[in-house]
Structures are given as structure tokens and as C-alpha cells.
Amino acid sequence: MVVQVGINGFGRIGRIVLRATESNKDVQVVAINDPFIPLDYMVYMLKYDTVHGRFDGSVEAKDGKLVVNGHAIAVSAERDPTSIPWGSAGADYVVESTGVFTTTEAASAHLKGGAKKVIISAPSADAPMFVCGVNLEAYKSEYKVISNASCTTNCLAPLAKVINDNFGIADGLMTTVHATTATQKTVDGPSHKDWRGGRAAAANIIPSSTGAAKAVGKVIPALNGKLTGMAFRVPTPDVSVVDLTVNLSKGASYDEIKQAIKKASETTMKGVLGYTSDAVVSSDFVGEVCSSVFDAAAGIQLTPTFVKLIAWYDNEYGYSNRVVDLLVHAAKVDGAL
């Protein structure tokens, strides 16, 4: 069996989700909706990518459809999610990647068009949130709308889980040094809710808020209220890095901490949490499929209970692969695979 998938919003995440499905035998994209990108432009945007390079396959427009590696994908341009013909295209699972319909009520509009389940590729205020490697066991088939949380939560939560399970986290602060995203400005412009966020992305390091650390408490209840954090937006096109500084409940040497993370990366969190001791920099992680790669050589320890841990993530590619993994997990639990 193959899960038939629809994508609403053909932006950074939507396009990379499609790329990720091309190497996953359990998933096939059958429909894409985007009111702002006509078919010929979809071909161009999928084929060429400044960060991730040219698409490794064939892409063309034919008979009003997007044809990827010989497979025809229905295309629509509806602004109202209730009007998207998911049912007629056979799309049972829909990836909601516009960044607009992020609540259960808003995302549920896709169900009216024939979708059976919606995966939001963003944090949600009220939809159940899941992070691969952390809390997938909490998923229930009765959920019609679920969230894959944020790219930063996907990086932070696996690392936090390993540390908390082995040593306990009394409390901690996170900083993500985050690559530029599409919502930022190329030159100074109006941004009424976030004045700093309106400054030129390529010319500034911009302090910003993030709910990623607090969201860890939603997927790891034992850490609820124990973590918070902030972001610095920096002038790089992709790949971000988490700096997690924690007070441990149980003292440990840095070697013991590294060993616990390495063990998890090779067993329970293989494919989600990576491990490296090389002298790496951000560009080394473009195209990284893990949610989080622990940088063993970059962390520092002050006392046995006070430590700074560093983890890299491709905020586009790794996250998009987890969207697909979450979808596949849901489909298996639902009996669709």
C-alpha cells in the first residue's frame, strides 16, 4: 500500500516535503494546492533551488498537471481550504504547509474537501504536537489534525529527552542561531508586531522570540516549565544551531553525557538524532536528514551539573523529512499502511 498525499502551500517546506517523498516508497504525492504559484512556475521552483541544488529527477508540466519522475500530480489554486478537491485527487493525508492554517479549526477545513487527516508543518496552539523520536507513541488514530511542531523543537526535543532521561534537567535555557527564513525582509521594512524582525535579513544579527523551548514541555511533559529560550536570526540561507544550557539534576562528566547521546543516536533515536565529533560548520549540514546532530566537540562544561550542549539542524530539509516520517507513522497506526 501507498499513502496518497496532498500538499497545501508549495513554499520552502512544501517543495522539500515533495522532494523527501520521492525517496520514500510508502508515500506518493497526488495533489498540490497553491493559489499563488501557477503550474509552470511550480516546475521551475521544484527544479531549481539555491540551497539544495537542482532536483534529482524529471519535472515537467503536462495536461494541466505537475509530472515528477513520470508521476502526474493534480494541481489546484484554491484560497479557501474547503474548496480544495483532495477527495477527487485521492489525497487522504494532507500536509498543511502554508503557515496560515495552524489551528485545529482552520486546518480541519481540509477535511471538508475529502482529506482524512491533516499534518500541520508548524507549531499549533491547540492541535496535538508530535516530534519523531520523542512522543510518537502518544499518537491516536482519532486525531484528525496533528502538528509536527517547529524545526527548532524537532532539534531540541530529542537532545533534551536523552539528557533528561539519563541525568535529569532541573531547568535550562536555549538559544537557536537560526538561518534566514521567508518571512524576513531583504531591506528594512515595516514589521509592526516585531520591529527588529523588519530589519534587513542579510545585514543583521536579529534577536527574536521563539516558542520552541517551551513547546518541548508539550511533547515531554516532564520538562514543562523547565525550558525557555530565544533566537538570533543570522544572514545565512539555511542550517541552524541550538545552544542548550542546562542545570542537571544528577552530576555527570562531559564524556558521560557524550556517551549517552552517542548511544541514543545509534539505537532508539537513530535517524532522528545524529552525532559528530568532527570540526564542522553550518554548511556541512545542508541536506542533513536528521532532526538534530549533536556536536560533541563544541559543547562545554563548567561543573558536573552545569553544561552547554550544541546541536545542528537543517531547518528546511531535516524538518521536511520529519513531516513525512510523522505522516507515515500516523498512516501505519491508522491502518492505511
UniProtKB/Swiss-Prot annotation:
Active-site residue numbers: C151 (nucleophile)
Main location: cytoplasm
Top-tier EC class: oxidoreductase
Keywords annotated in UniProt: Cytoplasm, Glycolysis, NAD, Oxidoreductase
Induction: Highly expressed under anaerobic growth conditions in the presence of glucose and the expression is highly regulated in response to carbon source and/or anaerobiosis.
InterPro entries the UniProt entry points to: GlycerAld/Erythrose_P_DH, GlycerAld_3-P_DH_AS, GlycerAld_3-P_DH_cat, GlycerAld_3-P_DH_NAD(P)-bd, Glyceraldehyde-3-P_DH_1, NAD(P)-bd_dom_sf
Catalytic activity from the UniProt record: D-glyceraldehyde 3-phosphate + phosphate + NAD(+) = (2R)-3-phospho-glyceroyl phosphate + NADH + H(+)
Positions of D-glyceraldehyde 3-phosphate binding: S150, C151, T152, T181, T210, G211, R233
Annotated site location: Activates thiol group during catalysis: H178
GO cellular component labels: cytosol
Binding residues for NAD(+): R12, I13, D34, R79, N315
One Pfam family, short name: Gp_dh_C
Enzyme Commission no: 1.2.1.12
Subcellular location: Cytoplasm
Pathway per the UniProt entry: Carbohydrate degradation; glycolysis; pyruvate from D-glyceraldehyde 3-phosphate: step 1/5
Family as reported in the entry's similarity comment: Belongs to the glyceraldehyde-3-phosphate dehydrogenase family.
Stored NCBIfam families: GAPDH-I
Oligomer status and interactors: Homotetramer.
Record's protein name: Glyceraldehyde-3-phosphate dehydrogenase 1
Taxonomic source organism: Mucor circinelloides f. lusitanicus
Lineage: Eukaryota, Fungi, Fungi incertae sedis, Mucoromycota, Mucoromycotina
